[in-house]
Amino acid sequence: MISEQLIERWAAPEFAGVLDALLAEREPVYVVGGAVRDALLGRNAGVTDLDLALASPVLPAARRVADRLGWAYYPLDEERDVARIVLAREDAPPLVCDLAALRGELADDLALRDFTVNALALEIRRDHPPRLIDICGGAEDLHARLIRVVGPQSLASDPVRMLRAVRFAGQLGFAIEDGTERQIQPLANQVTQASAERQRDELWKILALPRPGDGLAELHRLGLLAHVLPEAAATDHIRQSPPHHLDVFGHTVQVMNYAAALRDWLTGQTNSLPDADLQAALLPWREKLAAHFAEELSAGHSRAGWLVWHALFHDTGKPGAFSEEIEDAGERRIRFFGHEEISATIAAERSDALRFSRREVQVAQIVAASHMRPHHLSESFPDGAISRRACYRFLRDTATGGREDRTGLDVLLLALADRQAPGKARGGGWGEYLSGIAGIIDFAFAPNRIAAGNTLVDGTTLMRSLDLAPGRMVGFLLESIAEAQAAGEVTSEDEALALAGELIRRAGFLPAVDGG
């Protein structure tokens, strides 16, 4: 039997049963990939996916093991003899075990992997202690904290590995080895040979790191960003006026890191935010905000994860909106009029090119287009007391799926990350700014918030009571009533109908006569 103590070092205990069942079929079985690497690094807590390699045929053995243990079986690649077995668990992520046929001898198989730290194997036999197999120097590179390619063709054979190098360096806190960097730079343009879906998935993992802005900067340093996210690369060296102290690219890096801090706080990965005042302002709604940002816009892509992407896209329109003028005092002032609309177009087009879902593209576009709205509201209500009518209009205009939609919250948190980025140069008014944002959040979660089904009157009632024919006037009146209801100016059906009548009189509108 496989030692439970061994399993506890690097994986969920249920995997012990899988290994024992496989060893009853044939031996040895090799544990390969990230689980071995993470075990040697002591980063193994909570491993829920395991990669195994064994001699062919794998598919029938995997099916028998799955049937015996009650796991689900999926043939992933019949030609290459690769299968997956999955154990669903209540209140915990599923356990996933991928089983692949060895590509030749074990040494040949390991030599085909991407980086030395991933080319490690643990040989498992029934009557022998586990044995670490390291033919590529992976253990030494783990100790040196380096990401090094296995061989001279590792990157050319699969260009998406260049993105993986950045991801693993950020994930593990390693540096990319000099020789590997020298291989990446002349091959950087080949990264687009990988499918859009594979590029997207690697970029998603990079942006899911604790400091995704640093990952973006590393992609740029290596020459990869211009090929996978050219609009972001184009923001480098685009100057800005105070309160900004960085160019647009440097600012974007900072906003992404602040957005990641908010993401990690909302998802429970951390219990504190860098700014204590910000944390205090958001704390009353943390649970509700967490529920909102847990919503998946597509499989595996939550609103929380998208916060960093919104930060990435929000100022990509600035190069196309750059202008410089001389003010009365003779000082040069840089402006970016309308950059949010350009950013919105870029966000939609790039998200679509990366094969994000239609819903994700829609949300990315509206958030980029709206990211200046909270700043403008703060300027209009400098004391932080944003009116209920303004709150209603903001949430209405940023909704992407009817009145129940709260995409405006995504805009607000992006604005908070954006407002933090200038640091001390942001000037005064931070407390008032937080009060204003908190007021909109409070309005969004208020029990009496205007939503589908709780308006004072509907179109049928309006047309019947005021003798109106269907048309744009009815829509205008309903929206006007909803605004007034949100502002607390009308609280009953009678008051709503009276308001509608007054609006009709002001407009000089004469109702249509039936049959006329």
Regions found by a protein language model. Name each.
Residues 1-516:
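Catalytic cores of the polymerase beta-like nucleotidyltransferase superfamily
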